[in-house]
Amino acid sequence: MIEQQKRKGPELPLVPVKRQRHELLLGAAGSGPGAGQQQAAPGALLQAGPPRCSSLQAPIMLLSGHEGEVYCCKFHPNGSTLASAGFDRLILLWNVYGDCDNYATLKGHSGAVMELHYNTDGSMLFSASTDKTVAVWDSETGERVKRLKGHTSFVNSCYPARRGPQLVCTGSDDGTVKLWDIRKKAAIQTFQNTYQVLAVTFNDTSDQIISGGIDNDIKVWDLRQNKLTYTMRGHADSVTGLSLSSEGSYLLSNAMDNTVRVWDVRPFAPKERCVRIFQGNVHNFEKNLLRCSWSPDGSKIAAGSADRFVYVWDTTSRRILYKLPGHAGSINEVAFHPDEPIILSASSDKRLYMGEIQ
């Protein structure tokens, strides 16, 4: 297990955009982890800021321990733990509450881990890697229970089915989208694209796979008919992140054209499926696969950004609710806690932050 340097973040409120509060600066570039941070005794009362709205030990918690860029992060469905992974090939498991201890390290990938997902009940954790494989882990024991081999290049994305038999879809630089049943050795279906696939997800009923890649298009593949059903066009650059809303009607996409879009993926939706466009976050020369996510109730969305800020928008008004500073590198993924108003961010600065949002 790697030795982690766990520190609490500064005990200041996260600052919503356009609200008059004192400026929040968390470990700006060059200041190093923990620079100027105040340590509080466990259970200490906070003297300033708005009332607390979560069960975190402090309004902002810093999780450090990764030895390279952190590409992905996810809360366990029960909300008590989280997983993170990235360039150092390790998957770190953390407690959400208390001191946010890094209580386990999952080793097995020989390349960077590009994406992580828990299945619906949280019993399994899926990881996609540049070692051309997807690993399936028992989230209780930390044991790797399956290794899915078949891609011939980097696996950029994976997503487990929400219900039914444990299926998982994957997307790779080899241009294919694959469907796997983890009870079987090889992929059970393969869809060929002309270009690299950067992001995949299932629709709500898991009879379609949705993929995005460097051809700028979002494709919907029908598993029963084994063919491309329709294509959603609108992005002007590579699609790097996809996320299905909790009720399954809308798809969120993040792309290198510096827009985040919401698409209506219901079966009989109008032909023009793009229903919202959000702006503010940016991609840059690093070309990281910046992901995106929905809040559990669908009222907010969040996206990774190369300008070192976490962006959170109101889904209806499209207004930026929060532009959160703190990281010293590209923010690659942002995740919402399943039960509490907590947001988690993973960054190329090797760190994660957890913070309360009102």
From Swiss-Prot:
WD repeats lie at residues 65-104, 108-147, 150-190, 192-231, 234-273, 284-323, 326-358. SUPFAM superfamilies: WD40 repeat-like. The modification Asymmetric dimethylarginine is found at R21. The keyword Ubl conjugation applies. Keywords: Isopeptide bond, Methylation, mRNA processing, mRNA splicing, Nucleus, Repeat, Spliceosome, Ubl conjugation, WD repeat. One of its GO terms (biological process) is mRNA processing. There is a cross-link at K18, K271 (Glycyl lysine isopeptide (Lys-Gly) (interchain with G-Cter in SUMO2)). Signal peptide: none annotated. It is found in: Nucleus. Pfam families: WD40. Required for pre-mRNA splicing as component of the activated spliceosome. Component of the U5 small nuclear ribonucleoprotein (snRNP) complex and the U4/U6-U5 tri-snRNP complex, building blocks of the spliceosome. As a component of the minor spliceosome, involved in the splicing of U12-type introns in pre-mRNAs. Component of the pre-catalytic and catalytic spliceosome complexes. Component of the postcatalytic spliceosome P complex. Part of the U5 snRNP complex. Interacts with PRPF8. Component of the U4/U6-U5 tri-snRNP complex composed of the U4, U6 and U5 snRNAs and at least PRPF3, PRPF4, PRPF6, PRPF8, PRPF31, SNRNP200, TXNL4A, WDR57, SNRNP40, DDX23, CD2BP2, PPIH, SNU13, EFTUD2, SART1 and USP39. Component of the minor spliceosome, which splices U12-type introns. This is U5 small nuclear ribonucleoprotein 40 kDa protein. It comes from Bos taurus (Bovine).
